[in-house]
A protein has these predicted regions:
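Membrane-spanning beta-strand positions in outer-membrane beta-barrel proteins
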Residues: 1-3, 37-41, 123, 127, ...
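Transmembrane beta-strand segments that form the barrel wall of outer-membrane beta-barrel proteins
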Residues: 6-10
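Surface-exposed loop/interface segments of Gram-negative outer-membrane beta-barrel transport/assembly proteins
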Residues: 13-20, 24-119, 135-174
Length: 174
């Protein structure tokens, strides 16, 4: 017999430039020839998440809550307005702002996480005689994640680029 299914999930986030997408599949195949049964189960999934820093001090949500609603998002020339924020400002120095323009923060930063997971199993079973069967199975579980984070130097705080890949070399086989 067989069973195959596929799924797609797409959710837009509450904050500008945030969303989550997931693609997944499941496949089960099995068969029998006389007293010999065999099969395979396979389930891969891939997801991508565009995250926005919404946590704590300096996050998009806190900045949106702390900014006065009369503070314009853009200057007359179309650039982002950072000067309406007097919170923590020292003269013309905006490097110490804990609260920034939340729209600029959401648009000038990215935090993308890609995840891949695969779970699979192959099995076989033979019945030698009624009441005595031998079953063998091999399975594996792989998970990989890639995170790419960027913060534009246009934001008044420190501009930075961060790249990271993590892996578990123990899980590799050849």
């Amino acid at each position: 017999g067989y069973f195959v299914s596929a799924n797609y999930y797409d959710k837009e986030g509450v904050v500008i430039n945030s969303d989550f997408k997931k693609y997944s599949m499941r496949m089960n195949l099995d068969g029998q020839y006389k007293k010999f049964k065999f099969g395979v189960n396979f389930s891969p999934s891939y997801s991508t998440s565009n995250r926005v820093d919404a946590s704590g001090a300096g996050g998009v949500v806190q900045s949106a809550l702390m900014m006065p609603p009369v503070w314009p998002v853009y200057n007359a020339d179309g650039s982002y307005n950072y000067q309406g924020n007097g919170y923590w400002r020292i003269g013309n120095d905006y490097q110490h702002n804990a609260i920034l323009n939340p729209v600029a923060m959401a648009n000038l930063q990215s935090d993308v996480v890609d995840r891949m997971a695969i779970v699979g199993k192959v099995f076989a079973e033979i019945e030698f005689f009624k009441g005595l069967t031998y079953n063998i199975s091999f399975g594996g579980d792989y998970y990989g994640s890639h995170n790419d984070t960027y913060r534009s130097s246009e934001l008044p705080l420190l501009g930075q680029k961060y790249y990271d890949t993590k892996s578990n070399p123990i899980a590799y086989s050849s």
